[in-house]
Amino acid sequence: MNIVILAAGTGKRMRSALPKVLHPLAGRPLLSHVIATARTLQPSRLVVVVGHGAEQVQTAVAAPDVQFAVQAEQLGTGHAVRQALPLLDPAQPTLVLYGDVPLTRASTLRRLVDAAREGSYGILTVTLDDPTGYGRIVRDAAGFVTRIVEQKDASPEQLKIAEINTGIIVTPTGQLAMWLGALKNENAQGEYYLTDVVELAIEAGFDVVTSQPDDEWETLGVNSKAQLAELERIHQRTIADALLVDGVTLADPARVDVRGTLRCGRDVSIDVNCVFEGNVTLADNVTIGPNCVIRNASVGAGTRIDAFTHIDGAELGANTVIGPYARLRPGAQLADEAHVGNFVEVKNAVIGHGSKANHLTYIGDADIGARVNIGAGTITCNYDGANKFRTVIEDDVFVGSDTQLVAPVRVGRGVTIAAGTTIWKDVAEGVLALNEKTQTAKSGYVRPVKKKS
């Protein structure tokens, strides 16, 4: 089967320099959603028709299995499909999709293709409570489709028809090429409409078959930011419903956003206003507090992530405790039972089994062993203005508050570092490391008194 995706429109109502089909839905371009669905049908040819912002669109979705046809002039949907004909296999049927209609299920498209398998002309239709503005499907007394009539051309009786044309079709490619060549642009816009092909098919004696989606929102398109926001909420609720079916506890299904792939184990609990981006895996018994952002991360079983935590490109072992207000950046690796607390930032660092950094700390480019305690205000000074260096802290080290470790430096096993110490040389195992300082107490000191105005 050939699949053609129309993605050449300007999208004026989006009021954006970004081509309409590249606006994101759940973190991916609209067009990427359509291409992903098309791939599940395993087409022999997959062609995207580009026009407005063609180079930008091609760059965004380029892949070995995707070919591009260019519609240099915006002369309608029929004209757009015509540009794809040289890239299609004439012996296979062609399914036409739209780059701004992202939520059509693959199962819906399979039903349409199956309905038209005997060489018929297939149309995906939908029945709406309010069909205003859409082309109506006109049938004869026997129920056969006779034509599609646009809103402006419909009679009062036809305006009562609730079944509308979605624009998604499947048809034999050879006949499609012939019908496209016969299209006329005798309309106010001077465009060639793909919807006009159905009458040519009927005139040629073709059976016109229809199929409908399970949900009408599958056929909704995006022409404005308001419609984009509407589809975002529909899509997110669909994802949330699937998570609930899988046993995930969501404090409020309307307040979780998945912008990628979220895999959850058993007894996972997610509080409100959490965002998951890229590929995220949550193992069994993970608890996510409110207002967290987690991107491209794996979280081990029994882990608790408290409120307002940001995690990006990190790996967390089992039974770790993160946050609140913690930030794990790319390359952060936490072993089982590690703790990273409030206002702690970890980047490109390994934190060993049972080690804790509970307050106000920066750990960057570091290797921290097991059972290490990192006191509040500790900083690994990893950057000299030109290059970055690593800090190594071996097992069972106690780091006092307000410590600076100037990399490259190694702290041996069992070391105790006194509060307020700057470490710039390697420290041998088992010692107390401190910078000796003099504490002075002066009697007779009088605090300044605020002057009266």
Curated annotation (Swiss-Prot):
Known partners and oligomeric status: Homotrimer.
PANTHER family in UniProt: BIFUNCTIONAL PROTEIN GLMU (PTHR43584:SF3), NUCLEOTIDYL TRANSFERASE (PTHR43584)
Record organism: Burkholderia ambifaria (strain MC40-6)
CC cofactor: Mg(2+)
Record function comment: Catalyzes the last two sequential reactions in the de novo biosynthetic pathway for UDP-N-acetylglucosamine (UDP-GlcNAc). The C-terminal domain catalyzes the transfer of acetyl group from acetyl coenzyme A to glucosamine-1-phosphate (GlcN-1-P) to produce N-acetylglucosamine-1-phosphate (GlcNAc-1-P), which is converted into UDP-GlcNAc by the transfer of uridine 5-monophosphate (from uridine 5-triphosphate), a reaction catalyzed by the N-terminal domain.
Protein family according to the UniProt entry: In the N-terminal section; belongs to the N-acetylglucosamine-1-phosphate uridyltransferase family. In the C-terminal section; belongs to the transferase hexapeptide repeat family.
Protein name: Bifunctional protein GlmU
Broad class of the protein's primary localization: cytoplasm
Pathway where this protein functions: Nucleotide-sugar biosynthesis; UDP-N-acetyl-alpha-D-glucosamine biosynthesis; N-acetyl-alpha-D-glucosamine 1-phosphate from alpha-D-glucosamine 6-phosphate (route II): step 2/2; Nucleotide-sugar biosynthesis; UDP-N-acetyl-alpha-D-glucosamine biosynthesis; UDP-N-acetyl-alpha-D-glucosamine from N-acetyl-alpha-D-glucosamine 1-phosphate: step 1/1; Bacterial outer membrane biogenesis; LPS lipid A biosynthesis
Annotated Gene3D superfamilies: Hexapeptide repeat proteins, Spore Coat Polysaccharide Biosynthesis Protein SpsA, Chain A
